[in-house]
Regions:
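A short, N-terminal "cap"/entry segment at the start of jelly-roll beta-barrel domains
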Residues: 1-37, 117-138
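Conserved short histidine dyad/triad with adjacent acidic residue
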Residues: 27, 40-55
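Glycine- and acidic-residue-biased ligand/ion/polar-headgroup-sensing regions
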Residues: 46, 55-74
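A short hydrophobic beta-strand segment most commonly corresponding to one strand
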Residues: 60, 87, 101-121
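Short acidic-glycine-tyrosine-enriched beta hairpin
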Residues: 74-90
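Asparagine-centered strand-capping/turn motif at beta-strand->loop junctions
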Residues: 97-99
Length: 138
């Protein structure tokens, strides 16, 4: 059994090439073969979000704090809250992040295929992002 203590976890800024706004990544892990699991705790300041991206075997997000938005390409923006669990199926182009006015933290868990857990794509435009969920006042 391997135990990683919170005090030993490193926090890094989310790379500007993959995130818009201020995001931090804590406790990033990649398990050794034969496991394909990787993950991290990701915190988004208000207005921060990922680029569009896909996961070859899907992704689970466990929301631990705040309020966020997510969208699968071509679909509506969905709002989620602390305590919610999100599943994005394999290959679905999507983004996720904080709302425009509230921060959000989630634990992201995904598996790698051929050594890669994610394919990063273009940035989510401000216009796409600020649409927010249907029926919500921005």
């Amino acid at each position: 059994m391997e135990v990683t203590r919170k005090a030993d976890m490193k926090t890094v800024d989310g790379p500007a090439g993959y995130f818009t706004g201020k995001a931090t990544i804590t406790g990033q892990f990649q398990r050794p073969d034969p496991s394909r699991v990787s993950g991290a705790i990701v915190h988004f300041e208000p207005g921060a979000r990922t680029n569009w991206h896909t996961h070859p075997l899907g992704q689970t997000l466990i929301v631990t704090e705040g309020i966020g938005w997510t969208q699968v390409e071509g679909g509506p923006v969905h709002e989620f809250h602390a305590g919610d669990i999100l599943w994005c199926p394999a290959g679905h182009k999507h983004w996720h992040g904080a709302t425009a006015h509230a921060g959000m933290t989630h634990i992201a868990i995904q598996e790698s295929l051929n050594g890669s857990p994610v394919t990063w794509m273009e940035k989510v435009t401000d216009e796409e992002y600020l649409r927010g969920p249907a029926g919500k006042d921005q």
